[in-house]
Amino acid sequence: MGLLGFGGAAAEAAQVATHHTTVLLDHHAGACEAVARAAEKAAEEVAAIKMRLQVIRDAAREHHLTIAYATGTALPPPDLSSYSPADQQAILNTAIRRASNVCWPTPRPPMRIWPRRFDAPPGPCRASRSMPNSAMRHPQCRRCRRRTATLRRSSGGGIR
């Protein structure tokens, strides 16, 4: 038994709806693949960080140091007095050297906050970009005011 072919507006609407659903599902599949790639990359980064942390812990243990997890600093062991004076000095020197070699992230420069009276950073404002040949541009913008003043001086006092 074969399927009957239907025609007309209803069949065309069903075909358009099916095509639309297919396009949406394809787009959704692409987005899901992008999320999966990002998750795999994040998992690799987490594994690398865990490995680096294990190396740091092993190095601290090797040098008889304990790590204060609340502050992230390497400290001499609590039973430091049980070691010989030479070992005590070596442990303290290592703790100081490790503390001074810690690489802290460099602070990011603060974001520049533009004055509130100007809504845009100095540069071509939106109005001057949309009207490049206009003499009277955007009166609130510092750059446009400067440009207007220059035009007034060069044209003999009047803007046309």
Curated annotation (Swiss-Prot):
This is Uncharacterized protein Rv0964c. It comes from Mycobacterium tuberculosis (strain ATCC 25618 / H37Rv).
